[in-house]
Amino acid sequence: MALSPRDTTKRRAQRVRTRLRKVANGRPRLSVFRSAKNIYAQVIDDERGVTLAAASSLEGEKKDKGSDKDAAARVGALVAQRAIEKGVKDVVFDRGGYLYHGRVKALADAAREAGLNF
């Protein structure tokens, strides 16, 4: 029985998260969600089930396009700034089954430059 592309993506993302939980050692998870028009990131404490910091490309000026690498870099810097304000410096990067390329990579690089360690 063949799986649909959507089911395959969901299973891959779940597999990645399961591996991350084994490696995390209590560190929060920087989770990325990418849509066709926007990108979202949040720092999640899985032990308590709480979102510590979040940012998306919907924030800010409406005229800016939210689907390019510049928007992803802004989101990465913003979520890193908010996480550091909450006292979180070390995280585990959860790319959510997306390839580490393009917007996902731009978000991760900006978060690293803003001070998050992963």
Swiss-Prot record:
Intrachain disulfide bonds: none
GO BP annotations, alphabetical order: translation
The protein's matches in Gene3D superfamilies, at most eight in alphabetical order, are given as: 3.30.420.100
Where are the annotated coiled coils located? none
Q: Which InterPro entries match?
A: Ribosomal_uL18_bac-type, Ribosomal_uL18_bac/euk
A GO term, aspect molecular function: structural constituent of ribosome
UniProt entry keywords in alphabetical sequence: Ribonucleoprotein, Ribosomal protein, RNA-binding, rRNA-binding
What do we know about how this protein assembles, alone or with others?
Part of the 50S ribosomal subunit; part of the 5S rRNA/L5/L18/L25 subcomplex. Contacts the 5S and 23S rRNAs.
Sequence similarity = Belongs to the universal ribosomal protein uL18 family.
Protein name, per record: Large ribosomal subunit protein uL18
